[in-house]
Design a protein with these regions (language model features):
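Conserved strand-loop elements at the edges of beta-sheets that form or border functional pockets
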Residues: 71, 80, 94, 222-223
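N-terminal low-complexity, Pro/Thr-rich disordered segments
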Residues: 39-63
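Alpha-helical scaffolding within the catalytic cores
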Residues: 64, 96-98, 196
Length: 237
């Protein structure tokens, strides 16, 4: 999908993202409220976190530390900025990332990092908080993939505690620990840092990728654009 076709229907979300950093403290307060009520919020039936076995197999044997997937000494770092409710992020997870992981990450050429933004709505906040808990367990990337596989309708209230627990379990995450971590100040700090970094880098839509080589030069790719991402990786080497 081209950058233009990705960005056009998401222009409203892009504008809203610019507001996130300015209201980060307020977002944390809101997150605490919605997280505490997540298990009882009205929501559609919890989708099954399908595809957990092949999803987890993709990550077998790849180290993950502090959310960084791959060999820590890999010469190229790709940081993906996502919103877990973003359908294009889910599409990218299904179509682009498996090949990238097989060909670039498992071979030690690239390592992946992620920043979970939360501009679509409260379900994004709840999901990002539990993703922070998965990061602490070295299972962020399996959690992201499992969430996308079970992704519901935007802002329908589907990201309840029960839904997030199911996703976490399918990704090999200790769900109790992840949901408990989601309520902490440390989880809120992760969200605020992600929002701040997005603003600093001028990231205003998801997915966006920052590709950095050993020289520290950053190449930004916006949207689900495989050709541009491949070119950025080559340029970063």
């Amino acid at each position: 999908m081209s950058v233009a076709s990705h960005q056009q229907p998401r222009a409203t979300r892009a504008r809203r993202l610019a507001l996130v950093a300015a209201v980060a403290v307020a977002a944390v307060v809101i997150a605490a409220v919605v997280s505490s009520s997540g298990g009882s919020s009205p929501a559609p039936a919890t989708p099954a976190a399908g595809g957990s076995a092949p999803t987890n197999a993709l990550f077998t044997g790849i180290p993950e530390q502090n959310g960084v997937l791959g060999d820590p000494s890999a010469p190229v770092t790709i940081t993906e900025f996502v919103d877990l409710q973003c359908p294009i992020c889910a599409e990218t997870s299904r179509t682009t990332l498996p090949q990238l992981i097989q060909n670039q990450v498992k071979t030690g050429k690239v390592k992946l990092d992620a920043r979970a933004l939360q501009f679509i709505g409260p379900d994004s906040v709840r999901a990002a908080r539990v993703a922070a808990g998965a990061r602490e367990q070295g299972r962020l990337w399996p959690f992201l993939a499992a969430f996308y596989a079970a992704q519901g309708q935007e802002n329908s209230g589907y990201a309840t505690d029960a839904f997030l627990r199911s996703v976490a379990q399918s990704a090999g995450v200790n769900a109790d620990e992840a949901l408990a971590y989601a309520q902490t100040d440390a989880a809120a700090d992760q969200l605020n840092q992600a929002n701040s970094e997005a603003q600093t880098r001028g990231i205003d839509s998801t997915p966006s990728f920052v590709v950095t080589g050993k020289d520290g030069k950053a190449h930004v790719v916006v949207g689900h654009d495989d050709a541009s991402l491949t070119a950025a990786i080559k340029a970063a080497r």
